[in-house]
Every structure is written in C-alpha cells, then in structure tokens.
Amino acid sequence: MFRTPHTLQFCSVHYKTFIDAIHALQSRISQKVLCRSCSSRVSGPAKKYDVDPSQFPQENIRNFCIVAHVDHGKSTLSDRLLEFTDTIRTSKDNQQVLDRLPVERERGITVKAQTVSMVYHRPGHESPFLLNLIDTPGHVDFSYEVLRSVAVCQGVILLVDANQGVQAQTVANFNMAFCSDLTILPVLNKVDLKNADVEGVTSQMENLFGTRREDVLKVSAKLGTGVEELIEAIIDRIPSPKGDADAKFRGFLLDSWYDRYRGVIALLMAVDGTLRLGDEIISHMTGTSYTVRDLGFLNPLETPTAMLCAGQAGYVVANMRSPKEAHVGDTLSHKSADIKPLPKLEESKPMVFAGIYPEDQSQNNELRSAIDRLLLNDPSVQVSIESNPALGQGWRLGFLGLLHMDVFCQRLDQEFDAQVVVTAPSVSYKVKVHGAKNIKKYGGEMVTVNNPLHLPDRSIIREYYEPMAFGTIITPGTYLRDVTSLCVDRRGVPKSTQDVDDNTILLQYKFPLNEIIVDFYDELKSITSGYASFDYEETGYEESSLVQMQILINGKVVEELTTIVHTTRAQRVGRSMLLKLKECIPQQLYAVALQAAVGAKVLAREDIRALKKNVLAKCYGGDITRKVKLLKRHSEKQKKLRLIGNVEVPRDAFIKVLKRT
C-alpha cells in the first residue's frame, strides 16, 4: 500500500495517543486496587454476598410446598408470595415466574417442581424469616415431583379452587401429605370470582378432609388479597426444620440440571451442619468425592452465598461432569465414616411404556445424548435399548403417564431439536412360566414383559397378570349414569361411593391400567361437559385373561405390530389396526390379505384389492374361448405372484399404525 509522509505522521500520532490511553487505564486500575487493599486493611474485607445464611436460625426457617389440582392457581399464588416478600418486583408481567420451561408456558401447566427462597421481615421481629417455597405440578403424571417435594418439607398449602371445588387430585395430594405427617394449611383460592362458592367448598373440605371451618384461609392469587394472612399462617402453623446445626454436613439431593460450562448443578436441602465453599463432599450412592466450587440460594435466580446452613435449600456446583453422577434422593455429606445416609426416596414405577426412535437413524447419537440430559432433570423415566426392524435402533422408555410422555417428547424437540417417532403406548405385564428349564432361562417364575415381542411362548405360560389402578372420580350427580356406564365399559369394578355435597359425588373404581391410560380421561371430560375430574394410583398386578395378537400380511407375521390385549378387546383392537394398515399399504399387482390373529384363530380380516389390468383390451371380438384363455392365464400369474411376492410395507405405514392416535 502506498503511504505519504503525511499519512505516516498521522498514524504515528494516533499510535502514541493509543499508547498513552493504555498507560492511563493501567494507572487507574492500579490505583483502584491499591485503594481497595488499603480500605480492606482498615475496615475488613469488602462485602461479597448479598445474603448471609447465618442470620437465619432454624427456628426462623419454614420449608413448605403448594399442592393442588390442575389449574387451581398454584403458580399464580407463588407469584404473589414472591411479590409480597419483595423477592421480585411487583409487575403485571409476573406470570408463572417459576415455570421456566417452554413447555410449561406453552401448556400453562407446571411440569417441574421449582424451589425459591424468600426473605420475609415480619413486623415486630428483629430477625428475618427464610421461607423456602416449592411450587409443585398438579397433574397426576408428575406426582413423583410432588413426592420429592413433600419429602423435604414440614408443611403444605392445600390449595382448592373456590369455583370448581375439591377435585380428584386434591384428594390424592391430601392423602400424600397426611401419610407423610405434614402440617396441612387448607386454602381457598379465587374467592373474588362471581361464581365462587366459598361456603359450599369449605363444607366439602370439612366432609372429605376433616378440616375445621375456621382454619380454612381465603385468598385471591390474582388480586393478592389474603396473601399477608397466608404468610403469617405459614410462620405460625408450619413447624421449623429439626436438623442438627452443629453436626457435620449432610444434605438431600432434591434435583439437578446440567450446565455446559459448570457441569451438573445440584439442588440440595441441607439437613444437618453447614456447607462452605471449598468443602469436600461425598456421594453416599456412588462413593465419589467432590469439591464445592459455588453455592447459594435460588432467589429465584442463583444468588451466591458463603455457606448453606441446616434447614436451608440451595444450589451447589461441584466438579460433577457427567449427568449420570447425580442421583435424586442421594445423600451428600462431609467425608466421615460415622455419617449415616438419609432415607432414600421410593423409586417411581413407570406405568406407560413406549418406543422412541429417531426420524433419521443418522441422528441416533444426538438423540441418545439428548435423552441422557433430560434424564438428569427427570429421573422418573426408565430407559432400555431396543431395536425394531422397521424403525431401526431406538429406546424403550417408561413414563408415569401419557402427559408425562407427551411433555418428555416435546422437551426433546424444544430443548434439543430432536425429532422422534413415538410408538403406541403400552403397559408392563407379568406372566408366570412353568418348567424348571424355563424358570432358569427367565431368572424366575414371574417374568415382566415391557415389550409384546418379548412375551414367552404361550405353551410355557401358566398365568397372565396385568397392572391395576385405583381410580377416583369426582362428578356432578347429573352425569352419574353416563360415568358409571363408561367405567363398566372399561372393565371397572366399583369400590365406593361418597357424597361430597348435595350436587357432587365421589366414585372409586378399580381399573385395568391399560383401559385408562390412553383416552379414558378425554371421554370422561366429554360425557360430563368437562365438569368431572379423575385421578388414579397403581395398586399392583392381578391375574387376567390376556392374549398375544399378531398381524399377518398374506400369511406372514409382522413382528413389529405384535401386541398384548385382553381377550374381550382383541377383535376390536385387531380391526382398528387392520383399517389403519389398509390405508397405508399401496395397492399391489395381486390381492393382499391383512389378518389379525391369536394363535391359529383369525379375529379380523381386511383385503387390499389388486390393481386392475384389462387383459381383454387387445380382443375386439372373435371366439369367446380366446378371452377365457387370457383371463385364466392372468389369474394364474396373480396366484404365483401372491405366493412368491413380498409385500413391501412402507416405513410410514409402521409409524402410522404404531403411533398413538
């Protein structure tokens, strides 16, 4: 490049100016450092943290969660509690502050239990209170999240919609809290609505839960009325944690999530002792040691602190690099031989199983990584590898319910951009085999079958067992006949009936789990105009009459479409599958027979007609025997093609038949 003397002079001047600026900046920095060091010698170290956990003795700590039926206002009440305690600024934009997942905001439901620490300065008290709130999901499919929350709390807010009244999940949440021996605060929400029946719903709670009428608090989470009285009741009625503050640290791993830069971030409830930066902790489940790199409160964002004391909940960043190192329910403590682990959580039992496959097999490794990351945040899902000739390699996943499965797959899509194919959901069955050789082969007399393809040969099966569920239905009395008819049609056995009030009835049935996991709730809502509610819990296995149904195409078994059904449902399910398959398989040069069979017995059949060919097109008249000869020859060719021809079933056909509707 050509440069004039003027240009060189201009560049040298600006270069000198730049160097002078750098020296000036270095001088300022050194002066600031010097001033800071001098001031620290005089007045001590500068304040590093916004919150000092040591100012909260255990008697000033309350750990509680909010439990309620779906859409009764848990998240809205959490927003008002955060605003009243000045944890967040009051704003009209504060909606579902603790619902951080995209799927939660899109569906308007809580999927993950979220923890937040609130500092409350009670009038007339010098020392502040620390209120640890856990906002829990309301749907039955996420009951494991509620169970984890209940395990570390001393009290619960039982929230009931004053407009809708007590619902089925409300009963389940009450039973869970009651069995855990927690203090229960009954609270009526949405009392500001015109149709709110405060007295009527209070009577419902009195009849079902035995609560005293004067103990029921009345709030409006939308307007914020009654929130101050609720906070005062939390402090007065819910007991403080009873850990040993002077003992060595011991904490309960409540939840965890993954950060690509810091690794695994654990959510801990400190039970005993104090945890500080730099402490060495050990996992009682894996025996691995870690060094604490960062810790603090969730307020609701991460707020670093110098320590976590007994009774407090907070996040901990140690050198956990693999998502598989964090186990929910694990005990993390200081290294010591005399520290006993805390009681473990009861493991969740998957109720619904489905196959998950990548839409493109080249994305198999990426999907495996995405599933591992989600399992860190959702340990209730069980995973095993499976292979399908039609769909390729995939995974068999166990979920707590259909909504749980829906949300899991949606999170795969939204958070990891993983497109998946989900097969039709099924439940886990059990069979009893006989014969010493067979018992040795399967490792016991009882064999659990999560995949219909893995069902042992029926000649060695002595008994079949299917999972059962205890269902609770709360419905207006005007729909009683329709609801009863639906329950009987789903093979339900009535157990009890109770009047909630003059217009509402509580029904309890025992159902086969397979009859209620897919579309029972939708049908119940449909026949009751949306007024009924439903909740269920697994009650174990019972002997049943089950069969393995196979789909045949031109006499050849298609293993991928094998399923297990009850004998009374076999024909209906078989017919439905054949109709879907018929729509998906293109016409061939020969007729194709689709059959649903149990053993040698055919239960249903559908035919795909052959493509028509006008073999008489070249005959314009003449002897009739010529036409007969051509028709006969064409018929023989079709028979031969049918015997030796392979019907190629498109991959899309398997997806449409196996995919849930």
Curated annotation (Swiss-Prot):
Q: Name one GO molecular function term.
A: GTPase activity
* Alphabetically ordered keywords of this record: GTP-binding, Hydrolase, Membrane, Mitochondrion, Mitochondrion inner membrane, Nucleotide-binding, Protein biosynthesis
Q: Does the keyword NAD apply?
A: no
Point out the signal peptide segment: none
Query: Where does this protein reside within or beyond the cell?
Result: Mitochondrion inner membrane
Cellular component terms, GO, for this chain's entry? mitochondrial inner membrane; mitochondrial matrix; mitochondrion
In terms of InterPro entries, this protein maps to: EF-4, EFG_II, EFG_III/V, EFG_V-like, G_TR_CS, LepA_C_sf, LepA_CTD, LepA_IV
Q: What is its EC number?
A: 3.6.5.-
Reaction(s) catalyzed by this protein? GTP + H2O = GDP + phosphate + H(+)
> What membrane topology was assigned to this protein in its record?
Peripheral membrane protein
Which Pfam families did the record assign?
EFG_C, EFG_III, GTP_EFTU, LepA_C
Top-tier EC class? hydrolase
Q: Which residues are GTP-binding?
A: 68-75, 135-139, 189-192
Domain (tr-type G): residue spans on this chain: 59-242
**Principal location listed in the UniProt entry:** mitochondrion
GO BP terms in the entry: positive regulation of translation; translation
PANTHER family in alphabetical order: TRANSLATION FACTOR GUF1, MITOCHONDRIAL, TRANSLATION FACTOR GUF1-RELATED
Give the family this protein belongs to, as stated in its UniProt record.
Answer: Belongs to the TRAFAC class translation factor GTPase superfamily. Classic translation factor GTPase family. LepA subfamily.
Further remarks about this protein from its record: This protein may be expected to contain an N-terminal transit peptide but none has been predicted.
Q: What does this protein do?
A: Promotes mitochondrial protein synthesis. May act as a fidelity factor of the translation reaction, by catalyzing a one-codon backward translocation of tRNAs on improperly translocated ribosomes. Binds to mitochondrial ribosomes in a GTP-dependent manner.
HAMAP family, alphabetized: LepA
Query: Which protein are we looking at?
Result: Translation factor GUF1 homolog, mitochondrial
